[in-house]
């Protein structure tokens, strides 16, 4: 065919060889902060009990160790599967370390677009992937300004059942619990 090929200028050229121009770029554009994930040197069950008894959180999902202790707890005061997640790390330098802050996107397509934007801007990320716990899709990246780990998060499920029974996970199930 005789046709002129569109050539992008150096400023608008994509790093993706099969795409002429960079992705439309007004940032990843999250809708809201979704949740925070904390690491703690305190036993997770102790932390989770405090959040339930003193703060009114509901336990949604948890990881139980063979000795009955919790290694992780996903909790919320809203219909979200979690507003906060708490994980036990005996080597955490304090009782409360931010593991990540999660931002919500509308759908999986927005998550894939976010991956393109991060790649175009030279920001290293992990994902996209899917968590078994929470049934959500994710990308993890480090905020180059603050050094804080961010999760770009979508899907998941909402809980409207007043008699919700927390989902128990074991260490043997972490190959699908954390990511697949």
Stretches with model-predicted labels:
Residues 47-52, 118, 141, 146-147:
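Conserved active-site tyrosine of GNAT-family acetyltransferases
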Residues 65-67, 92-93, 130-134:
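A short beta-turn/loop motif at secondary-structure boundaries
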